[in-house]
Amino acid sequence: MKYKEQEFTLELKENIQCMEKEIERISFKLFKDYSYFYIEKNMELFIELIRDKEYPFETGYSLSVSIAVLDEEGKMIEFYTVPIWECCNYFLGVPLQIRLWGSKLSGELVDESYCEIEEELKERLEEFLQFADEE
């Protein structure tokens, strides 16, 4: 869901922070549940919440959860990211990382619920394991 700068409220900020905490909890749970299966296949699993910048309504702020799978040599063989929140300036529809005169600040929050994000991540983890079995 897209938000204009005028819609950047304390309620939205709290919603983003709540989403961050819940996604972090889900990430730890999934890592705990799935890392053993990857170790059995001589692979390494990383699930990480990535936050660029500190303040959610700052230009260039982004929040996402990423899954990375490394083979036994340490090479990345799978990668997947789910964006949660992104705040950016736009000038004539073009995203900018800096604030220019006449540009508009807006943000986009994922439309999915925590449960839907958890299911999406589980599906990817299962897919990556299935792909490893086929090789």
Q: Can you say where each PLM-predicted feature lies in the sequence?
A:
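Well-ordered alpha/beta subsegment
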Residues: 112-115, 119, 123-126, 130, ...
